[in-house]
Amino acid sequence: MQYHVNGALVPEDEATVSVLDRGFMYGDAAFETLRVYGGDPFEWGAHRERLQHTAETLGFGDAVPEDLRKRVDETLAANDLADAYCKVSVSRGVQPGKLTPDPEVDPTVVVITKSLPRGGPDGERVWDDPAEVQTVRTRRIPSDALPADIKSHNYLNGILGRLELQRSAGDGDPADECLVRDIDGNVAEGATSNVFFVSEAGLRTPSADLDLLPGVTRDIVLELAREEGFPVETGAYSLDDVRNADEAFLTNSTWEIRPIGTVDGIEVGTGPMTKLLQRLYDERVERRHY
């Protein structure tokens, strides 16, 4: 494999970043994870826009290179990848070892790709089964403390949630995803996913006004549902709202749409709306990339 590091393609075992890089020292970096279908990054514009938003929030908006898409394409071509996982990172770069950043930024820009076959109607999903989801004590960091709508290299909030799953499982298999609440007790999101559920009133998902990261896949699902005329609501929901749902699923770029099998041991499962949204999502990918 070859990775793109600071404008050059390098072999995987030679791809390095300085120990003085602020992304390594402080998590002072922005990133995006996306899927590639048929050699073309899915929803590139939305991912590029969010990467820019994160960088601007962190104070180095000018550091995102204009030729970033070209670097992604070069990395895919160098590894002969058509269907792939891609991660793009932009850090503030190497600066003196102090917390206050220098205004002059020489960014570190890294593009990583690896094979990730498409699921779709005729393939196999990256997940094996519907997700087992478990509520954790870890709460979502309030946006007043750390903006929830950015993707920085500081991912400790999600890591702590996943660690809870491991510790609570003991010698058994941990749940696939944690269900994280905000400090007011509202359901927010998973460690790396957004949460949807279906009730008699229609499709529901926590509002972007809460402390959560509104994912690119989340936006697509909301768009597809509205195009189909489904009743859609975003709001503040309790754990019982999700536990008692008729259907529930998770979304992110890697999983796409993954049904939830259980929440805290309570069976929820998939259903007609989840299956239809999966099909509509697959059809959009097919139309745009194949």
Label the predicted regions:
Residues D62-V64:
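N-proximal low-complexity "stem/linker" segments adjacent to membrane-targeting elements
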Residues E66-D122:
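Active-site pocket-lining segments that scaffold enzyme catalytic pockets across diverse folds
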Residues M1-F60, T100-Y290:
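Helix-start/capping segments and mature chain N-termini
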